């Protein structure tokens, strides 16, 4: 058993195909089959079921798959950590964040990071916070930014950002002449909600007492779309203050306070406690922590 065989096995399991796995590892289908046979002989067990239309893991194969992924990650980590003993910060970093964080909070930080460490390659995994947490915990993502709070004894968490959520209306909306409204007034407006995610959960809870009269006019998949539709006066919404700076400056929308309502979105930087991170990942963590609270809001921790 060697790393090449394990790599081939992992690709076959993921792609459910010998031929497609062969393309990934630059081997013929017969060579891939030979490597799998050698693994099955070494473990004295059938690892893959080839009888179905696609290749499936057997129970023994599922056990080996988990170990194979861990072994390959440990190999990559060890190679990187040995390389890190030199003076140059280099190598890959896999970073996880949701779309809004990638669009509105990270570009300036990542641009500065690339200027400082041009030999580091950053790969971004974009998804919801719970998916990012899963990837950080299984080791396939080095560092992530997720919505707080969270409870995980396996993760180190640094609070880095706190942003107030405000009520957003078009500059054409009559409410734009005001600085503050009541929640009852908001409930009477055509609401635009995000389809899923943290903000949707917060808004569903906020408007629960007004359920009988709330009119959710639209559910949209991204913050960018919500801003455009609110700007066109197709409805109203709530948004993190920093995500609408450009639209407020351009006069397209106005952000209002809601009497008696204080909503915040908090973000944390997360990585595994038990993992030795490469210097490139450590450098990125350090830079992000230097830039914490760019919104100017107080740090509660």
Q: Whereabouts are the PLM-identified features?
A:
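A short LG(V/I)-centered, amphipathic sequence patch enriched
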Residues: 18, 40-59
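Secondary-structure junction motif
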Residues: 189-210, 277-286, 292-299
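Central regulatory/effector-binding core of bacterial HTH transcription factors
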Residues: 88-153, 211, 220
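Alpha-helical linker/hinge and terminal dimerization helices associated
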Residues: 42-43, 64-86, 295
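A late-sequence structural motif
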Residues: 105, 171, 254-298
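Flexible hinge/capping segments at coil-to-helix
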Residues: 152-191
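Hydrophobic hinge/microswitch elements
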Residues: 128-141, 146-147, 198-255
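Short helix-boundary/capping micro-motifs
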Residues: 11-28
